[in-house]
Structure formats: C-alpha cells, structure tokens
C-alpha cells in the first residue's frame, strides 16, 4: 500500500513540524493568524505534492522555503492592506518570561521592515537558522543573507529608537 505509507509519513512530518511552520508564519505575518494559516496550508500542500522527491532530503527546509516564498509573493501581489496584530503572535520559548508590551512593540516594528528583510530576521533570529540554511530557504547567496540581515537590524534599531523617542515625549 504505497499511498498509505506516503500518507502516514507525511502525517508524521506534519505532526512534528506544523508548530514550527506556524510560528514562522505568525512572525512573517506579524500576528495575522488567518494569513499565517493560509501560508502554512500552502506550504504543506506543496510538500505533500512533492513528498516522494523531498522526504528523504528533508521536508523541513523545503517547507520553510515554500512558506517564505508564499509570503513574499503575497506581499508583492497585494496592495498595502491593514495588518492585524494578535496578542499571541509570538509564543515565547522557554527562555523566560517576556513582557507583552515589548512583544507588541517588536511586532509593530517588524511591520515597518520590508518583507524580504523581515523574512531574513524571522529565519535567522526566531527560527535559529544559520546563514547557509537561511540562504537555502530564501534561494539566495549567503552574502545576500548577511547584507539583508544587517540592513534589517539597522532598520529595526531605527524604528525601535523612533518608537522609544515617541514614548518619552
């Protein structure tokens, strides 16, 4: 029963990686749960279609690449539309308690960063991918990942500094 084995293997993959995909999608969409679920569904659909080819190589990197590409495609196609920010967009890891106000500030700041740069930050710092893995997911050179990371961090610093100055007034 070859189809059954494929379905079983795919189901096991989804059970193991869906949370990570959803976390990445939530970060990319700055907390828009519905858009994040759409991205994850798109990624998992493509993973399933190509399962025979990719499951031995590792479906995770492929799924994350599809997820990021779907996000970037959506941003290119769509006219600027309001971004929704939900309280549970960031699910802090077990590194300790994180102030909800700080998370909201970071989420809002991420909205002001170009989608490609936001994707680099999410993959590098929230998904803990190294430069080479990030380059594979984004289908670009390692140098591009490094330069986009530097530009994104500078932009994030500028936005956060501006927000802090506004709050102090």
Pin down the residues of each PLM region.
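Short amphipathic alpha-helical boundary/capping segments
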Residues: 10-12, 105-113
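The DNA-contacting recognition helix of HTH DNA-binding domains
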Residues: 18, 33, 117, 142, ...
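Short, charged helix-capping/linker segments at alpha-helix termini
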Residues: 2-12, 22-42, 50-58
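Arg/Lys-rich amphipathic alpha helix in sigma70-family domain 2
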Residues: 65-86, 99
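Short helix-coil-helix linker/hinge
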Residues: 100, 110-118
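A short pre-motif secondary-structure segment
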Residues: 120-124
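DNA-recognition helix of helix-turn-helix
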Residues: 138-163
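Short, small-hydrophobic-rich alpha-helical interface motif
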Residues: 21, 25, 36-47, 66, ...
């Amino acid at each position: 029963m070859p189809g059954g084995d494929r379905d079983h293997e795919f189901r096991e993959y989804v059970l193991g990686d869906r949370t990570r995909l959803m976390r990445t999608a939530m970060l990319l969409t700055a907390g828009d749960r519905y858009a994040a679920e759409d991205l994850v569904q798109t990624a998992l659909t493509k993973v399933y279609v190509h399962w025979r080819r990719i499951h031995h190589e590792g479906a995770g990197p492929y799924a994350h690449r599809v997820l990021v590409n779907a996000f970037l495609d959506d941003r290119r196609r769509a006219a600027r539309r309001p971004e929704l920010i939900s309280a549970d967009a960031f699910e802090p890891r077990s590194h300790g308690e994180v102030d909800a106000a700080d998370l909201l500030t970071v989420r809002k700041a991420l909205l002001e960063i170009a989608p490609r740069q936001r994707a680099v930050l999410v993959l590098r710092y929230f998904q803990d991918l190294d430069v080479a893995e990030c380059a594979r997911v984004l289908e670009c050179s390692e140098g591009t990942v490094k330069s986009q990371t530097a530009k994104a961090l500078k932009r994030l610093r500028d936005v956060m500094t501006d927000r802090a100055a506004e709050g102090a007034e």
